[in-house]
């Protein structure tokens, strides 16, 4: 008998109490999984966000599957509320131990770092897609679909610059799932989102007549050239402030604290709101969602803005622009 999606294992399911049915396969609520699929996608935050499109694609190809996704604790929020994901697991020793004793029909690992590739090799599955760990310690493609991306990543000045596929197209190829313009998705609780917006507008005396520009001025430490210059932002801010209706929100991590403070002080305007380090990742999503236009480099802010369908102005340094699909938003 196939395992029903309502099966608890240690206690009766809800329909046992509702219908009193003991023989599961005779119940009208019996709804078994046909495939068990595991996605490993741990890093980085922005990549986890833009990988969410894959969940929808998998469910289109495998509509009766159980989809489990393991990710870093700080990225879990990006997956919560996604109707295509059945189970979310945080990356820790307990979760790894639990997954080691299970078996999946399909395992998809999108990361090339050792912690992810070693998990892919340690977990049991009938079919492996994406990346595993070679016995000599380097990542290796586990299926034909991953070979193109693997080769591309080893040739930055050749194949990577010539590549015309977006990130979503690449991970769908790795996963052996047809890509049909599926978009990244983040779920925000409607009531929480409204409360955040109302409180923010009240605190800073913003009305719906204002136009809000969110400027995410920094980037992660691995590729520092993803961020625009401070002088460039100062010129932009001064230009935007010429319209009295415009409100500017500065965002960033601790790395941008000094930079944003200097941008703010260069104008001495009360229409600049410096929110650097003020909010959690969840609140940061709420902040992006209340903005009219998001201006950012290739960072997690860009991918959140895409997922929330915000208008975007973006710029690219080391990232090949063709890998980023803005889905008509900028």
Enumerate the language-model features and the residues they cover.
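Catalytic machinery of carbohydrate-active enzymes
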Residues: 1-330
């Amino acid at each position: 008998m196939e395992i029903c999606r309502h099966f608890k294992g240690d206690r009766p399911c809800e329909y046992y109490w509702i219908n009193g049915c003991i023989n599961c396969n005779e119940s009208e609520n019996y709804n078994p999984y046909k495939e068990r699929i595991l996605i490993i996608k741990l890093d980085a935050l922005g990549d986890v966000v833009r990988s969410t499109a894959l969940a929808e694609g998998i469910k289109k190809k495998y509509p009766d599957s159980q989809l489990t996704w393991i990710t870093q604790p700080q990225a879990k929020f990006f997956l919560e509320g996604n109707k295509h994901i059945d189970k979310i697991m945080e990356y820790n020793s307990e979760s790894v131990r639990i997954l080691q004793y299970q078996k999946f029909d399909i395992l998809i690992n999108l990361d090339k770092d050792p912690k992810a590739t070693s998990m892919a090799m340690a977990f049991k599955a009938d079919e492996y897609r994406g990346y595993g760990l070679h016995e000599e310690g380097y990542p290796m493609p586990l299926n034909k679909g991953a070979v193109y991306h693997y080769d591309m990543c080893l040739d930055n000045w050749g194949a990577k610059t010539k590549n015309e596929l977006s990130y979503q197209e690449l991970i769908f190829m790795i996963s052996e799932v047809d890509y049909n313009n599926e978009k990244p998705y983040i779920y925000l609780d409607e009531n929480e989102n409204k409360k955040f917006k109302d409180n923010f507008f009240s605190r800073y005396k913003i009305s719906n007549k204002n136009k809000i520009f969110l400027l995410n001025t920094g980037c992660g430490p691995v590729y520092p050239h993803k961020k625009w210059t401070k002088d460039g932002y100062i010129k932009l801010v001064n230009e935007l402030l010429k319209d009295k209706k415009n409100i500017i929100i500065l965002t960033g991590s601790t790395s941008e604290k000094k930079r944003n403070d200097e941008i703010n002080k260069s104008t001495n305007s009360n229409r600049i709101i410096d929110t650097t380090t003020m909010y959690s990742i969840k609140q940061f999503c709420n902040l992006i969602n209340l903005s009219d236009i998001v201006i950012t480099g290739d960072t997690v802010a860009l991918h959140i803005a895409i997922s929330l369908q915000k208008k975007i102005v973006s710029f690219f340094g080391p990232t090949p622009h063709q890998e980023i699909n803005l889905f008509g938003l900028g």
